[in-house]
Amino acid sequence: MANRLKEKYLNEVVPALTEQFNYSSVMAVPKVDKIVLNMGVGDAVSNAKNLEKAAQELALISGQKPLITKAKKSIAGFRLREGVAIGAKVTLRGERMYEFLDKLVTVSLPRVRDFHGVPTKSFDGRGNYTLGVKEQLIFPEINFDDVDKTRGMDIVIVTTANTDEESRALLTGLGMPFAK
């Protein structure tokens, strides 16, 4: 069974983008390539349990096991040594990617306090969109009682679009609530 958001992309977004940007082929229409969730846990240097808890929460949110990221350089000011585990990340592709994006747009973002839409300035110039979330409690999989500390995360939506304008049209078509 195809995902609801993927069907919307194929049936509504592709024809709309083809008409708007005059693509010669359906294959030229931009699509979401992958979504990367990154949770940096700075206090994991002093307490490794914090990193385990963050990785568990990321696994619940994404539906797959996160990769533990390690420090590339030693930074004395942060008491950081090269090779120490300091975060977790997940790369979503295919069905899980569409399921996560659908859940993010329809369930999680509306649960953010004082939400007026996601910022429009977070495109990187190459058609990718980055979004910061201040707390993991907006996701329905996270039980409020089990949370020891609120942690934020970065969500990067990588698209095949060449420009920010094309990428924004794609994400708007998929239901991303941009701020006016």
From Swiss-Prot:
**GO biological process per UniProt:** translation
**Keyword vocabulary terms for this entry:** Ribonucleoprotein, Ribosomal protein, RNA-binding, rRNA-binding, tRNA-binding
Ribosomal protein as UniProt keyword: yes
A Pfam family hit? Ribosomal_L5
Name a GO CC annotation attached to this entry: ribonucleoprotein complex
Q: What is stated as this protein's family in its record? A: Belongs to the universal ribosomal protein uL5 family.
Question: How does the annotation summarize its subunit structure?
Answer: Part of the 50S ribosomal subunit; part of the 5S rRNA/L5/L18/L25 subcomplex. Contacts the 5S rRNA and the P site tRNA. Forms a bridge to the 30S subunit in the 70S ribosome.
Entries under PANTHER family matching the protein: 60S RIBOSOMAL PROTEIN L11-RELATED
Per its record, how is this protein called by name? Large ribosomal subunit protein uL5
Which gene name belongs to this protein? rplE
